Amino acid sequence: MIIAHQSGPEPCAIIAAMHVDLLRLALGLYFVGFAHSVLTALNKKQTMFRPALAAVSAGFVLHVASIVLRAMDVRYLPLTQRYEAFSFFGALAALGFLIAYAKYRIAPLSVFAFPLIFIMTFVANLFYDPSPAIPDVLRSNWLYIHTPLIFLGYAALFIAFAAATMYLIQEHALKSKHPVRFYNWLPSLEICDDLAYKSLAIGFPLITLGIMTGALWAQAVWGVWARDAKVLFSFLTWLVYLLLIFYRLIAGWRGRKAAYLSIVGFIGVLVTFLGTNYFGGPHTFQ
């Protein structure tokens, strides 16, 4: 008598299921951080920060594990699909916050960071593709250099944006005759400005190197720079940050002016990352 053995799930299928489950668990933990941000904004005072910090920290660990399993599943750096890009951005935003918090202990930064982390990860879940087809042009070692540099730069510039926003809120509160209670929780103007500047000092070189490696990649593939919306907006955003660096170092800009320009720069980052996807071109996420 022949006994038929039922084969179990394929290893790739198990890995794919695990990485999705881990990402959803991370999303659930990030929601605790998101709830903290909403409650703090509504109550105008710190609400459940420590549980939110623990949840987001645990979520980040699960998120990284999910990205590693995704890479094992698809066998390339998972940054070419919308699902992968949003997931990676969310993870790096979490990393940026955790590093900034470890150095500065600025709890109010969470009010700005946690919503972005949650939203990016939530959107990633909406675009999940179990069997992506990577274009041949992306099967290049440049993918492992150009794209992480850009995303790391984006994460650092997000922290600069959050610090600049805190600066403006704190400045307004100090001048107000009836400041809200939340202002007492904010760091000093000097700390906000210092965090914004140091984050800019990290983010600007990263996106500069990212743009340079992207140009070299385009030269190797097409012989010219790719002419698409993302290239244009990346360059315009880079110019904004170049002006910010210039005015800080040469003209001595500090405080409000630098904060406003930092916010304008990050709006450019969001337009580059989100908006230009609808214009087509080599950088369009599938």
What do these predicted ranges mean?
Residues 19-133, 145-173, 189-221, 227-286:
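Hydrophobic cores of alpha-helical transmembrane segments in multi-pass integral membrane proteins
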Residues 134-142:
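Active-site-proximal inter-transmembrane loops
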Residues 5-6:
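Low-complexity, intrinsically disordered or signal/transmembrane-proximal segments
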Residues 174-190:
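Juxtamembrane inter-helical linkers in multi-pass membrane proteins
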